[in-house]
Amino acid sequence: MKLIIFTGLVLFAIVSLIEAQAENEKACLPQYQVCTDAPGNCSSNLVCDCYGRYKSGARIGRNCFCLQKGVIYKREN
């Protein structure tokens, strides 16, 4: 009986550890990947940067990408 209880507790501990580790290791998005629906999922050295899309002065949407922190992107003509 003690062996069954001990085995159950050990299995419970192992499953809990696996679940906690999976949460800590959530998949992060690499550079230039779209993060519109998941702004917090960019890799640690990246930030989710969003830009509005406009057509004839009216906003038609928003795009977000994982970009390097501290880097300023400028439009080229």
Swiss-Prot record:
It is found in: Secreted. Residues 1-20 form the signal peptide. It holds the Pfam family Toxin_35. Residues 21-26 form a propeptide. Contains 4 disulfide bonds. GO terms for molecular function: toxin activity. This is U8-lycotoxin-Ls1c. It comes from Lycosa singoriensis.
